Structures are given as structure tokens and as C-alpha cells.
């Protein structure tokens, strides 16, 4: 910019690399700053049963062909390979991962691999039916999106969600034994910034 001081920073190659080291045959996976990579996020689908205003349009979405979506066998093999170079934590995401058919089967497959942490990010709409089976399958933790505790606002931001269903799902998750559930909230000025105290109180209870 004209008149502004110029700040020159070195260009860092952010490509992952494998360095030789103890612990595995190939050594741990590291990033361009030599930090070990131990955490993997896997998007199971780009499909979702919500249309949150900050995430996607209400209609006209270009979805990936189903043939391009990784099979459970491919996901399992990828996780096994990455565990050999240091990955110990996996989070299943989407889209909305609970709309993926036979999700419980995938969780069972991955839980048998001996990961330190296996978690799932979800909008919570299907937790009433899935919380207990997910826990039994070996899932360790849940991340659940709750942007508001007001039904009118919830419907406004999700365009089709059911707040009562999500809150009931959180109750089911706690009853199933999920004791370290994380609640995610997108802070939006002028929309839900008057609810942060109430959201914290809800999570505390």
C-alpha cells in the first residue's frame, strides 16, 4: 500500500513432510515448521440436513458425486496408514456426518484401531437415536453446534432445524456416557450476542 511500511516475512513451505525418527518405521508426520501432526479431520460427506446461513445457501448446492465419497474401507486404510506416522486423534465431520449411512459401522471400525481420541462434530439433530449406539461403538467425544437457545432464532439460522430435538439429543448423549461433550457456538453480532451468558449457564448445568 502506498505510504505504508513494508513488512517482509520469509515464505514457509507448509507442505507436510515425513521425517525419519524413532517410534515408527518412517518417523512422525510433520508440517513445514517441524511440528508433529497427530490430529486428523475426516469429512464423511458434504451433505447436511440443515442449511445454516453462515455455512451454505438454502438451495442450489453442488454436491460431490457419490462415487467420489470415500468408502469406509478407504477411510479405515487411510487412518491406519496415518497412525503409522504419528496420527493419534481423529474427528469425523461433514457436512453432517450423522446423515452418512451406516455411521455406526465406521465408528466401530475406527475404534478398533486404538486411537487416543475419536470424536464427532454434529448439529445434534439425530443424537436422540444415535447417541447410545455411537457410545457403544467406541466413540469418545461429541462436538455439538448450538448457536442459540431460542427456537425462533434457531430456525432462522438453520433454516430447518429443531432446537428441542437437539437439546433432547444432548440429554441422550449425557445419559449414554458422553461426559466431555463440547458445545460449539458461532458468535454473531446482533443475532445471538445477547445469549452468551445463557449458553454458558446451559453448558454448566
Enumerate the predicted regions with their spans.
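Short, flexible segments with low predicted structural confidence
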Residues: 19, 23-25, 50, 54, ...
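Canonical Radical SAM [4Fe-4S] cluster-binding loop centered on the CxxxCxxC motif
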Residues: 33-73, 84-85
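Conserved G/P- and acidic residue-centered "switch" motifs that form tight phosphate/ATP-binding loops
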Residues: 96
Amino acid at each position: 500500500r502506498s505510504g505504508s511500511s513494508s513488512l517482509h516475512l520469509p515464505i514457509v513451505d507448509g507442505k507436510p513432510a515425513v521425517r525419519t525418527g524413532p517410534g515408527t518405521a518412517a518417523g512422525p508426520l510433520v508440517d513445514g515448521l517441524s511440528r508433529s501432526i497427530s490430529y486428523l479431520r475426516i469429512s464423511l460427506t458434504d451433505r447436511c440436513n440443515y442449511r445454516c446461513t453462515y455455512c451454505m445457501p438454502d438451495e442450489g448446492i453442488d454436491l460431490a458425486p457419490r462415487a467420489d465419497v470415500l468408502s469406509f474401507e478407504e477411510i479405515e486404510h487411510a487412518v491406519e496408514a496415518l497412525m503409522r506416522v504419528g496420527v493419534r486423534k481423529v474427528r469425523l465431520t461433514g457436512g453432517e456426518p450423522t446423515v452418512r449411512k451406516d455411521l455406526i459401522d465406521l465408528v466401530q471400525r475406527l475404534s478398533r484401531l486404538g486411537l487416543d481420541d475419536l470424536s464427532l462434530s454434529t448439529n445434534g439433530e439425530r443424537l436422540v437415536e444415535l447417541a447410545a449406539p455411537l457410545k457403544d461403538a467406541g466413540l469418545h467425544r461429541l462436538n455439538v453446534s448450538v448457536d442459540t437457545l431460542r427456537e425462533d432464532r434457531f430456525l432462522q439460522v438453520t433454516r430447518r432445524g429443531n432446537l428441542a430435538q437437539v437439546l433432547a439429543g444432548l440429554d441422550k448423549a449425557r445419559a449414554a456416557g458422553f461426559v466431555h461433550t463440547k458445545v460449539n457456538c458461532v458468535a454473531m453480532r446482533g443475532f445471538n450476542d445477547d445469549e452468551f451468558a445463557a449458553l454458558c449457564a446451559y453448558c454448566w448445568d
